Amino acid sequence: MALAEPSRLTKPLPGGREGATVVLHPMLCAYMYSPPEFMAMTGGRLKVVRQVLFARKQQIKIPIVAFLVEHPVVGPMIIDTGFHPSVATDPKQNLGRLYAALYNIEMQPDQAISAQLRERKGIEPSDVRVAIMTHLHMDHASAISEFTSATYVLGAGEWRAFHGARPKLNGYVRHHVEHAVEYKEVPYDSPVIDSYSTFGRAYDLFGDGSVRLVATPGHTHGHQSVILRLKDREALVTGDAIYFTRTLDDERRGWAMADEHKWHRSIGEIRLYRRENPDALIIPGHDPEAWATLLPKYE
């Protein structure tokens, strides 16, 4: 299926309201078992391969997550999609044989974000009009087909990386994005981009300061993180810019890495943000310890 290139954002999306704050709902979509070296390398790539092939009992259980964000005018939006509901019963149908064989996934059908939105909030997938994608790896983009009314907002370079050579070896599954949805790209190299806090490249998505997208490339070429304005503080959803909170201190990179130099720069910006905003809620991509401390709702 041939898809049109994403259009570049040149102005904020409609719905902004001066002084608006948002409500954040973290949502656990599944657990996936991963070799420790895949998430935080202490040796070379050969050590990772050995753990994948021969040390499955040593694997760690990591959360697969997505987020509901409620804006007073825009309404419900999501950050990432988590796994498609079918992954709960037949992973290879959505993820393909390679990833279904590589990863042991624990998921119930009612953990899919579409099911959780209905159960927890009475929100139908068609009510979600904006979906912010930190990146398009399979554990973040598997359920794009569930939210076909949404405009999907990608970081600059992610679409090109997704459609590059050997997508599956780089964490992408082509059919995850092959749906008749609108894709838009944040042009982090254009004059509409500003800086914000400790981040050199930021985009005010609705023009009201409630949702800011910040470029955090490295894990993927087009990776972005999300800063949300709550009533009394900010929340930073890092995506996979950092897998664990401790990554900010030990700087142990994961296996999946598009540009290590840019990754170090990105985590440097996040580390400085943490120091300058000690009250901010910082949510890493796959940290079981951090996830265990999260509340169901942040206002």
Residue ranges and their predicted role:
Residues 23-26, 36-40, 59, 65-71, ...:
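Core dinuclear metal-dependent hydrolase active-site scaffold
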Residues 151-156, 237-239:
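Short hydrophobic/aromatic-enriched beta-strand-loop microsegments
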Residues 64, 92-154:
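Active-site metal-binding motif and surrounding structural segment of the metallo-beta-lactamase
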Residues 85, 90-95, 100-115, 221-299:
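Cap/insert and terminal regions of metallo-dependent hydrolase folds
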Residues 29-30, 81-84, 136, 157-158, ...:
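Active-site metal-binding loops of divalent metal-dependent hydrolases
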Residues 1-127, 155-215, 233-239, 276, ...:
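Metallo-beta-lactamase
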